Design a protein with these regions (language model features):
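Conserved ATP-binding subdomain of kinase catalytic cores across diverse folds
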Residues: 1-104
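Generic structural hydrophobic/aromatic packing signal, biased to beta-strands
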Residues: 28, 33, 64, 81, ...
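C-terminal catalytic region of ATP-dependent kinase domains
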Residues: 36-37, 166-271
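Active-site-proximal structural scaffolding
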Residues: 41, 45, 137, 151-154, ...
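Short coil/loop linkers at secondary-structure junctions
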Residues: 58-59, 132, 178, 268
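Short alpha-helical "patches" and their helix-cap loops
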Residues: 62-71, 154-164, 271
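ATP-dependent phospho-/nucleotidyl transfer catalytic cores
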Residues: 83-142, 245, 249-253, 264-265, ...
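Conserved kinase catalytic-core segment
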Residues: 117-181
């Protein structure tokens, strides 16, 4: 794979939008590039977007490609994607949106509700944005996050798009799947730890620390949104494309996890 040298470009530090540190990213022309920081985030982004192309996902999602980045004498694995914002558009995270209209922190507000279904604040978002299918959108996001075990979904990477010219809101494509599938091998999920250890340690966000509790609450309110149409063979083929960039232990862990997830979420698997 071609190595892209970014020494001539200043990185934008991806801080404030993840709970796990400071990831290097670059905006060059109409593409974003992100360097792996915690482990195999690039592989995670690429694999999730590849597999979503074999699904009935009713909402748009960012498509990622693998990238190898050279910067300051170091080689990074990573990924790249097209900038999905058009002219006059800005991305508004729910945290910023909620603060703008209420003066309160959404993350703090969620902790005030004892019942998970009450924390899924769809009505408030729809009233502010005039988007009428936000509940279905949020449910699809939680289905993706539960299946791929995204530990980093929070009120700063659930977002809507605002057009400053028309002053209208629309749904954002799904993005930020880098910390799926135990990709953080530097801190929380070392590659020599068992799958059972990782499963016992991981916690969901933002409505519950349990993936299934928040998913069940959303699906009960808004119904099942996604059908996955890929096979385990598809997973192996997609992983093979990136096997030269990541250790065999990483590929084996992802295969093992996704085989388990296909069994656990069999109701989402569509032939």
């Amino acid at each position: 794979m071609e190595i892209r040298n970014f020494d001539a470009y200043s990185p934008l530090h991806k801080s404030g939008h993840t709970s796990k540190g400071d990831q290097l990213k670059w905006k060059i022309d109409d593409r974003w590039y992100k360097a792996d920081y915690m482990g195999y985030e690039g592989l995670s982004e690429v694999l999730v977007s590849d597999l979503l192309q074999k699904s009935t996902c009713p909402f748009p999602f960012v498509e990622y490609e693998a990238a190898v980045i050279e910067y300051n004498g170091k080689i990074f694995q990573g990924c790249s994607s097209l900038d999905f914002l058009k002219a006059n558009q800005v991305l508004i995270p729910l945290e910023k949106l909620y603060r703008r209209y209420t003066g309160e922190s959404l993350a703090v507000k969620l902790s005030d509700f004892a019942d998970v279904s009450e924390r899924i604040l769809v009505t408030q978002v729809e009233e502010i944005t005039k988007i009428d299918n936000f509940g279905a959108y949020l449910t699809a996001m939680l289905e993706i996050d539960a299946f791929f075990m995204n530990e980093d979904r929070h009120t700063n990477n659930i977002a809507v798009i605002y057009n400053e010219k028309t002053q209208k809101y629309e749904l954002s494509p799904f993005f930020d799947q880098g910390l799926c599938m135990f990709a953080d091998i530097n801190q929380d999920y070392p590659i020599d730890q068992s799958l059972e250890y990782c499963l016992g340690k991981i916690e969901a966000k933002p409505f519950s620390s349990d993936f299934d509790i928040q998913l069940d609450a959303a699906e009960e309110l808004y119904g099942i949104q996604i059908g996955f149409q890929f096979t385990f063979k598809d997973i192996q083929i997609y992983l093979q494309k990136n096997s030269e960039n990541y250790p065999r232990e990483v590929i084996r862990r992802v295969e093992q996890l996704l085989r388990r997830q296909m069994r656990k979420y069999g109701y989402l698997m569509k032939k």
